[in-house]
UniProtKB/Swiss-Prot annotation:
GO terms for molecular function: 16S rRNA (adenine(1518)-N(6)/adenine(1519)-N(6))-dimethyltransferase activity; RNA binding. S-adenosyl-L-methionine binds at residues 20, 22, 47, 68, 90, 111. It is an enzyme of class 2 (transferase). It comes from Chlorobium chlorochromatii (strain CaD3). This is Ribosomal RNA small subunit methyltransferase A. GO terms for cellular component: cytosol. Specifically dimethylates two adjacent adenosines (A1518 and A1519) in the loop of a conserved hairpin near the 3'-end of 16S rRNA in the 30S particle. May play a critical role in biogenesis of 30S subunits. Its EC number is 2.1.1.182. Its main location: cytoplasm. PROSITE patterns: RRNA_A_DIMETH, SAM_RNA_A_N6_MT. It is found in: Cytoplasm. It comes from the Bacteria. Belongs to the class I-like SAM-binding methyltransferase superfamily. rRNA adenine N(6)-methyltransferase family. RsmA subfamily. Keywords: Cytoplasm, Methyltransferase, RNA-binding, rRNA processing, S-adenosyl-L-methionine, Transferase.
Length: 263
């Protein structure tokens, strides 16, 4: 562990919590600006740490809630910013839908832990009707996978599941040199904006279909899907392709033509 001290509060940066603290204020200002958060929005920050992003949000937003798992950091934020609400707990247990008051969607921001980036993204996907946008800093490699296009090595389950239900924007890259302790990898900021309507009536069924279609990337769609689905309505030529060759629209169309073998 590396000890990090700020304003007489010292924490041992915990690798299991993915704690890397941002030190460049230009990055936090840019993140808040591109998030589009307005003064009257209900804003939620994930993982404030020592408050690098919190400081900018407090200046811009009147209704801010932060979620912090580390007790020492949660206490620090309470003392430093007594005007905001602090939820001390695991973001993966947070019911964002319940937080969206009177049907007013949240604006979510955060420098999310590398160690649980994918679980956080899928948790947000479950609560996509609760937020207007989520502007998140994450590992650069994951950001590339999120924004990936078909027929690339990065294109897979994460890209398809997130892009099917949200507009995904890669905003900018962040050097590892602006963090303490310095991580081994670069970061990036992305923005997720949920689509107004879901592209598939059975959203959970589509997400399961995507996992099966990409389960073994080197196999054709036919080989990946035949055990789980009735494929008689699907063009046989298309079934000879790999999932990575199909756009999200094509995967949605394919999903509309198949039925699970239990149906």
């Amino acid at each position: 562990m590396i000890n990090v001290e700020y304003k007489h509060t010292q924490v041992a940066a915990k690798k299991k919590l993915g704690q890397n603290f941002l030190t460049d204020r230009n990055i936090t200002r840019k993140t808040v600006l591109l998030s589009g958060a307005k003064p009257d929005d209900q804003v939620v920050e994930i993982g404030p740490g020592f408050g690098a992003l919190t400081r900018e949000l407090v200046e811009e937003c009147h209704n801010l809630t932060v979620i912090e798992k580390d007790p020492t950091l949660a206490t620090f934020i309470r003392n430093e910013y007594p005007q905001i609400k602090v939820i001390e707990g695991d973001v993966l247990t947070i019911n964002f839908s319940a937080m969206a008051q009177a049907g007013k969607p949240l604006q979510i921001l955060g420098n999310i832990p590398y160690s649980i980036t994918s679980p956080i993204l899928f948790h947000l996907l479950e609560h996509r009707r609760a937020f207007r946008s989520a502007t998140l800093m994450m590992q650069h490699e994951v950001a590339l996978r999120l924004a990936a296009k078909p027929a690339t090595k990065e294109y897979g389950i994460l890209a398809v599941q997130m892009q099917a239900f949200c507009k995904v924007e890669y905003l900018f890259k962040v050097s590892r040199k602006v963090f303490k302790p310095q991580p081994k990898v670069e970061s990036a900021v992305i923005k997720l904006t949920p689509h107004a309507t879901d592209p598939a009536l059975d959203a959970d069924g589509f997400r399961r279909f995507v996992r099966i279609a990409f389960h073994q990337r080197r196999k054709t769609l036919l080989n990946n899907l035949k055990e789980s689905y009735n494929l008689e309505l699907v063009d046989s030529n298309k079934l000879q392709l790999r999932a990575e060759a199909l756009s999200i629209e094509e995967l949605l169309e394919l999903f509309s033509l198949i039925k699970t073998k239990s149906e």
